């Protein structure tokens, strides 16, 4: 069993699809680090600190999960965290090409870092942070796609933006 795995992402916000993959990764690996990327090029709705806090709340019941914000190259972060595995989610065939390129680049930069792909449960296969934000922005109910604390935080964030 590989001891330490990283599940990286922007998590803006964390969805039920992300949470499902985190729970399954926590069963597969001794220690899972949720690496939350600063990623300013994506112009996240939530700050890095807010995203770390939300992911901490959603994963609080998992003893072997740690949430850490980072910036810079993922392979450097993985090395700092002494992780040997990257966990990535594949929702659809359309995700595969990008993830395949990413896995090969990461392997070239850090040959000892292995990528493992997990697919979401069917009920989560269409959920993305972008879609959740879009639904919420137009007043739709996102409670079936995100943890209740995330739904509340998203509503509060959008109400502040409208004010």
Curated annotation (Swiss-Prot):
Q: Which InterPro entries match?
A: Cyt_trans-like, PPAT, Rossmann-like_a/b/a_fold
| Obligatory cofactor(s) | Mg(2+)
Residues holding substrate:
10, 42, 74, 88
Instruction: Give me the residues that bind ATP, please.
Output: 10-11, 18, 89-91, 99, 124-130
- Where would you find the membrane-spanning parts of this chain? none
* Main subcellular localisation: cytoplasm
Q: Name one GO biological process term.
A: coenzyme A biosynthetic process
Q: Which GO terms describe its molecular function?
A: ATP binding; pantetheine-phosphate adenylyltransferase activity
Q: Which GO terms describe its cellular component?
A: cytoplasm
Annotated site, Transition state stabilizer, chain positions: 18
Q: In which pathway does it act?
A: Cofactor biosynthesis; coenzyme A biosynthesis; CoA from (R)-pantothenate: step 4/5
Q: Which UniProt keywords apply?
A: ATP-binding, Coenzyme A biosynthesis, Cytoplasm, Magnesium, Nucleotide-binding, Nucleotidyltransferase, Transferase
Cross-referenced Pfam families: CTP_transf_like
Q: Where in the cell is it found?
A: Cytoplasm
**Superkingdom in the source lineage:** Bacteria
The UniProt entry, under PANTHER family, shows: PHOSPHOPANTETHEINE ADENYLYLTRANSFERASE (PTHR21342:SF1)
Annotated function? Reversibly transfers an adenylyl group from ATP to 4'-phosphopantetheine, yielding dephospho-CoA (dPCoA) and pyrophosphate.
For this chain, the family text in UniProt reads: Belongs to the bacterial CoaD family.
How does this polypeptide assemble, per the annotation? Homohexamer.
Per its record, how is this protein called by name? Answer: Phosphopantetheine adenylyltransferase
